[in-house]
Design a protein with these regions (language model features):
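Outer-membrane beta-barrel proteins, especially TonB-dependent receptors
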Residues: 1-210
Length: 210
């Protein structure tokens, strides 16, 4: 509280991170990667003495009009809890013969790859009298083929799909407006995308590529 206004300049926060990754590499060049991670974060904001307790939350709701009722001003606060879970699976497989470049003394090989990724994010928060709850589930799928005509000439083609599943609600009580004491905002929606792509690359040594 550098400006001494009784409010935290930055939220008080704590975070937990857990992750696990695996890699399997076969003798033929095939690689399989998979893993997951989990993150949880809590952020407490508002006045310096505010704590995330039921008693203090109820005091904010009950005594919002503390001046008119000649009551003690309740402590204002906010709290955010974020949770994120992610899992992924990737497999890459070489296909066809390799193409060799005698100048580079190296070879390239065409390959087929598949990637699946799932992400879940949830937020449970309140800011004074306003409550927000949101969940997002995202699934991404990508199938890609990379073909080498020569060491410096290649074509990538692929298809991909993307699904977003949103569930969001904002509870916005305004007790000082009798006709609109409680208002709920619903932002639920689903978004889907699918597409295909192609990319050709030609490289002149390490100096230029198109």
């Amino acid at each position: 509280d550098h400006n001494h206004d009784g409010f935290r300049d930055l939220p008080k926060s704590d975070q937990i991170n857990v992750a696990n990754k695996w890699l399997y590499a076969a003798d033929n060049g095939t690689q399989v990667r998979w893993g997951w991670k989990f993150v949880q974060e809590n952020r407490l904001g508002g006045m310096l003495d505010y704590k995330n307790t039921r008693t203090m939350r109820e005091a904010m709701e009950k005594d919002w009009d503390w001046r008119a009722g000649d009551k003690k001003m309740p402590l204002y606060g906010s709290h955010i809890r974020n949770r994120n879970a992610n899992g992924y699976f990737k497999v890459g497989m070489p296909v066809g013969p390799a193409v060799y470049d005698p100048d580079e003394q190296d070879e390239m090989r065409s390959n087929l790859a598949f990637v699946a990724d799932f992400d879940h994010f949830s937020e449970d928060a309140y800011f004074g009298l306003n409550d927000y709850r949101g969940n997002e589930n995202t699934l991404s799928l990508n199938l890609m083929y990379n073909h080498y005509f020569t060491y410096r000439s290649s074509l990538i083609v692929g298809v991909q799909g993307h699904l977003d599943y949103y569930r969001e609600k904002l509870l916005n009580p305004t007790p000082w407006i009798a006709a609109n004491s409680v208002r709920n905002y619903d932002f639920d929606r689903n978004e889907r995308e699918a597409g295909a792509y192609a990319e050709y690359t030609y490289a002149i040594k390490d100096k230029f590529s198109i």
